[in-house]
Amino acid sequence: MKMDVKICGLKTAEAVEHAVSLGASHTGFIFFPKSPRNIEPDDAGRLAERIRGRAKIVAVTVDADNDDLDEIVSALKPDILQLHGGEDPERVLTVKAIYGLPVMKALSIREASDLDRIDPYLGIVDRFLFDAKPPAGSELPGGNGVSFDWRLLDALDGSVDYMLSGGLNAENIGEALALTGARAVDTSSGVESAPGVKDLKLMDAFFDAVRRAEAVRPRSGSKT
């Protein structure tokens, strides 16, 4: 599959293997105790060994301190660190200097002004992940099953490398790709039967929908 597809919040060998067999380019393991997708570093490391070299391994953290990152990086040996909290550019630079790993920085989007937060990170992060802002009362920065208005990305500079996230599933991924021209997508709740429970049939449907969308849009991936 030409597009980067990340299945996030993986917790079982069955789900990890199935995601990669379908063509997932990235596998995400979440280290955030409040999340139903939280996994212990050693458990994630064992799962990652099953698919290492076949897909990128992403450690998803939320405002983690160095001690926590030390444990996660040691156990998982990730290819990418995804920082999904309020980490500022200085913190991103520090993390990159310590661990020598590419960093994907998540930014929450609800309105056009949220895109102003991109500039301070340019030249620092290796890729952005654009997620929807969590609903009121949610303790989770992502994985809430909500989307943002994808048309907001019309104003985005075409040179910005990003992964589209936020409530993506088999029913809406076609529209999301048509509107944004995204070359990388992320899903978690969109392939679950319950919070934290990956559904293999929903994974199948998601990848089928991505392939259908890829087949009908311009080769360049530009917006139609």
UniProtKB/Swiss-Prot annotation:
Gene3D superfamilies: Aldolase class I (3.20.20.70). Pathway: Amino-acid biosynthesis; L-tryptophan biosynthesis; L-tryptophan from chorismate: step 3/5. Coiled coil: none annotated. The keyword Cell division does not apply. It catalyses: N-(5-phospho-beta-D-ribosyl)anthranilate = 1-(2-carboxyphenylamino)-1-deoxy-D-ribulose 5-phosphate. Its EC number is 5.3.1.24. It holds the Pfam family PRAI. SUPFAM superfamilies: Ribulose-phoshate binding barrel. GO terms for biological process: L-tryptophan biosynthetic process. One of its GO terms (molecular function) is phosphoribosylanthranilate isomerase activity. It is an enzyme of class 5 (isomerase). Signal peptide: none annotated. The keyword Nuclease does not apply. Keywords: Amino-acid biosynthesis, Aromatic amino acid biosynthesis, Isomerase, Tryptophan biosynthesis. Belongs to the TrpF family. This is N-(5'-phosphoribosyl)anthranilate isomerase. It comes from Sinorhizobium fredii (strain NBRC 101917 / NGR234). The gene is trpF.
